[in-house]
Swiss-Prot record:
The keyword Phosphoprotein applies. It comes from the Viruses. It comes from Vaccinia virus (strain Western Reserve) (VACV). The lineage of its organism: Viruses, Varidnaviria, Bamfordvirae, Nucleocytoviricota, Pokkesviricetes. One of its GO terms (biological process) is DNA replication. This is DNA polymerase processivity factor component OPG148. Pfam families: Chordopox_A20R. Belongs to the orthopoxvirus OPG148 family. Keywords: DNA replication, Phosphoprotein.
């Protein structure tokens, strides 16, 4: 019988397989180790180890330089490497997250702009983007035929955010040390946090990456959220001294197994610290970490993609959309609106609050029932006032994990439907 750990490994193997063409060397190494594990465990798994990948970003980036070195004379383009989730937009014309292989929906105008850039030069292998705080910025553009600067200028004309860059001539052998690093970094005066610098010598394709940093451990006082958009909140890790440690998104928080009142490993830069992107210490399963973090953030929030959103009035909006009626600001308005339509009123009467709330959020029925069967609820006056997951193993299923992360929203809608039913039919 397949164990939950095996299922997790197989899920990761499948995800890496789908994204091989966009993988870096670390992801390829991880993929090959999982293929080796899968072959020894199950004999035949339908995929093979790879030595070379048609489009691996490692073909374009040398190993990171983290100690001072001499840089040769020549003309150079220096680019910032931003903190955030890295995505690749290629000739497949979809935005794919580097490493996970997950496709990501982007606005139509952004997709159109990316396609125009790709169509302008058949030598472009891919465009590299970073997503942070729900904002996109193009970080690099890989072309066999032209400088990324030319592509940046075109991308800007099409409305895409482009990076600051620096074009300079170095006339003699120069020591690239902390001082030079800081001078170049300060020239990139945009608001995006920068974790390293890449540079290209004129006439060469491969990027060199420079990252001077120090590892440190910091004590975590609290985990909170910061508003970054219309009902969009990013996790915020606060140290004992009140400083913020930068976090990419909810999944970054989960992978690192951050816990209040413990120490975490960080990469210290000149002006900020970054939560070190590694599978954190400890024996907690991913499901256990998800439960703990959601409990820490509180019942007022739910996981919404890479970020958190506040339950608030979001449930009312989704319910009115599902019922195809006018938007309502309060339950009183909702009851009045339902009373205007006999069809909607009959639907409310004949369908259980449980099923209507599930359908409203589009949860797959089988996965939803599996999750609910692993939970315990506290009910008062027919409303859910508290819930607790008793067995987190079911969260190994990514669909069930998504539903659980969103469950505070389900409870909000369920309680609204229960209230509406009482007012209409009792």
């Amino acid at each position: 019988m397949t164990s939950s750990a095996d299922l997790t490994n197989l899920k990761e193997l499948l995800s890496l397989y789908k994204s091989l063409k966009f993988s870096d060397s670390a992801a390829i190494e991880k993929y090959n180790s999982l293929v080796e594990w899968g072959t020894s465990t199950y004999w035949k798994i339908g995929v093979q180890k790879v030595a070379n990948v048609e489009t691996s970003i490692s073909d374009y980036y040398d190993e990171v330089k983290n100690k001072p070195f001499n840089i040769d004379p020549g003309y150079y383009i220096f680019l910032p490497v931003y903190f955030g989730s890295v995505f690749i937009y290629s000739k497949g014309k979809n935005m794919v997250e580097l490493g996970s292989g997950n496709s990501f929906q982007i606005p139509d105008d952004m997709r159109s702009a990316c396609n125009k850039v790709l169509d302008s030069d058949n030598g472009i292998d891919f465009l590299r983007f970073v997503l942070l705080n729900n904002r996109w910025i193009m970080e690099d553009a890989i072309s066999k035929y032209q400088s990324p600067v030319n592509i940046f200028k075109l991308a800007s004309e099409y409305g895409l955010n482009i990076p600051k860059y620096l074009e300079i001539e170095i006339e003699e052998d120069t020591l690239f040390d902390d001082e030079l690093y800081s001078i170049i970094e300060r020239s990139f005066d945009d608001k995006f946090p920068k974790i390293s610098i890449s540079y290209i010598k004129l006439g060469e394709l491969r990027r060199q990456v420079v990252d001077f940093f120090k590892f440190s451990f910091m004590y975590i006082e609290s985990i909170k959220v910061d508003r970054i958009g219309d009902n969009i909140f990013i996790p915020s890790v606060i140290t004992k001294s009140g400083k913020k440690i930068l976090v990419k998104d909810v999944d970054h928080l989960i992978r690192s197994k951050v816990r209040e009142h413990t120490f975490v490993k960080v990469k210290k830069k000149n002006t900020f610290s970054i939560l070190y992107d590694y599978d954190g210490n400890g024996t907690e399963t991913r499901g256990e970490v998800i439960k703990r973090i959601i409990d820490t953030i509180g019942r007022d929030y739910y996981v919404n993609g890479k970020y958190f959103s506040k339950v608030g009035s979001a449930g009312l909006k989704q319910l009115t959309n599902k019922l195809d009626i006018n938007e309502c600001a309060t339950v009183d308005e909702l009851v009045d609106e339902i009373n205007k339509s006999g069809t909607v009123k009959r639907k409310i009467k004949n369908q259980s609050a449980f099923d209507l709330s599930r359908e409203c959020l589009g949860y797959p029925e089988a996965d939803f029932i599996t999750l609910v069967n692993n939970m315990r609820f506290k009910i008062e006056n027919c409303k859910v006032v508290n819930f607790n997951i008793e067995n987190t193993n079911c969260l190994n299923n990514p669909s069930i994990e998504t539903i659980y992360g969103n469950f505070n929203q389900f409870v909000s809608i369920f309680n609204i439907v229960t209230d509406v039913k009482k007012r209409l039919f009792e």
